[in-house]
A protein has these predicted regions:
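Bacterial Sec-dependent N-terminal signal peptides
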Residues: 1-21
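N-terminal catalytic scaffold of extracellular/periplasmic and nuclease hydrolases
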Residues: 20-167, 172-189, 289-350
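Structural motif
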Residues: 29, 199-201, 236-240, 283
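Gly-rich Lys/Arg/Thr-decorated short loops/hinges at beta-loop-alpha junctions or inter-strand turns
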Residues: 84-88, 198-209, 245-250, 322-324
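Active-site His/acidic residue clusters
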Residues: 126-132, 204-212, 221-225, 229-234, ...
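Functional beta-strand-loop-alpha-helix junction segments that form "active/interaction loops"
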Residues: 95, 183-221
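Short amphipathic alpha-helices and their capping/turn segments at secondary-structure boundaries
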Residues: 105-109, 187-191, 221-231
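Metal-dependent active-site segment of extracytoplasmic phospho-/sulfohydrolases and closely related
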Residues: 37, 259-300
């Protein structure tokens, strides 16, 4: 508790230069699952040596280990970033004593923020789940979906429809969520006039971008930002490029690069919005690196890279963090992933 108080005081100090009457900032948190520097570089070299991340105002490095393991998984790292505590691999939204902890999304919601989550995995996958769910096993997808149904998140977009309407317990959560409207396409999502919308994009896991996944992440994010902005309230938006990680596990560079390119295009759209809005803090990082990827050859002229992997699992290497917008200087430096929560909380409670 004392550590938390000291950290909040330290993080609040740069905020004193802003007026006490200044409007609460929007926060867009973007996570490239499995996205290390080599994944970013592979996407960049495959895109005429350019990445939208070059537009970031501040850059740092993040330590990713879990409570008892040097190599984290997405559940533990997601919980660290979302709630500021270390926990065991596989555990979502609970500390090392299995005590539920409040996430930054839940704190922002309780402060009057609009909230939204978008993922290119199922919406009940470990990283998005860590922002609204409390379970001992990341694989308890039915329970995670049940907790999402009671979370009061305004907008959620991702795969995994079967965990809502084709469940072992025979419940149909979509019918139970009578205060939500459910979209069946991006066009339908855009048309619906409601402050609570679910868009379950695939019955199970979404396919990869290289396999033709639609709608695109950038289109889903732009549509969601437009909805959030229309309520004239601050908002918290979590965006996960989930399948950079999946390609890394398969040592499949086509999958990795196609996901990286889509994530990078989405970063560009988010930066465009933030630069125009002038009251949106954007934070972009990864939960961990996947595959131990190295770029060993290639050709800039042809935008080609030759990659090698040392693993089909996660690694313990630090991952980068990028930021833009008001208070983005807070995210400079080298620090633990739990401090991302501390810094975001300091912005919200200022």
């Amino acid at each position: 508790m004392l550590r938390k108080l000291i950290l909040i005081i330290v993080f609040l100090s740069p905020l004193f230069s802003f007026s006490q009457d200044s409007k609460a900032p929007n926060i867009i948190m973007m996570i490239g699952d499995g996205m290390g520097l080599s994944q970013i570089s592979s996407g960049m070299y495959s895109n005429n040596n350019y990445t939208s991340l070059e537009r970031s105002q501040h850059v740092g490095l993040i330590k990713t280990h879990s409570f008892d393991n040097l190599v984290t998984d997405s559940a533990a790292s997601g919980t660290a970033m979302s709630s500021g505590v270390k926990t065991y691999n596989r555990v979502v939204g609970m500390d090392e004593n299995f005590i539920p902890v409040k996430s930054i999304l839940e704190i922002s919601r309780d402060k009057g923020y609009m909230t939204a989550i978008i993922a290119t995995s199922t919406i009940v996958h470990a990283t998005p789940a860590s922002y609204y769910s409390k379970v001992k096993s990341r694989y308890d997808y039915n329970e995670i979906a049940s907790q999402l149904s009671k979370s009061n998140i305004n907008f959620f977009v991702g795969g995994g429809e079967k965990y809502f309407n084709d469940r072992r317990d025979k419940r149909n959560l979509m019918n139970e969520m009578d205060d939500y409207s459910f979209a069946n396409s991006l066009e339908n999502f855009i048309e619906i006039n409601s402050n609570k919308i679910g868009f379950l994009t695939y019955y199970d896991d979404p396919i990869g971008k290289h396999e033709g996944r639609k709608p695109s992440l950038e289109d889903m994010v732009q549509a969601t930002i437009k909805k959030l902005k229309s309520f004239n309230k601050p908002f918290f938006l979590l965006v996960e490029g989930s399948q950079i990680d999946w390609g890394g596990h398969d040592n499949d560079s086509e999958h990795v690069i196609s996901e990286m390119l889509e994530f990078d295009r989405t970063v560009g759209k988010v930066f465009n919005f933030a630069e125009k809005d002038k009251n949106t803090t954007v934070v972009i990082t990864a939960d961990h690196e996947t595959g131990g990827l190295s770029i060993v050859d290639g050709n800039l002229e042809d935008s080609k890279v030759v990659n090698k992997y040392v693993s089909e699992d996660h690694t313990a290497t630090m991952v980068p963090i990028f930021s833009l917008g008001p208070y983005s200087s807070l995210f400079n430096g080298i620090y633990d992933n739990t401090e991302i929560f501390d810094k975001l909380e300091a912005i919200i409670i200022k």
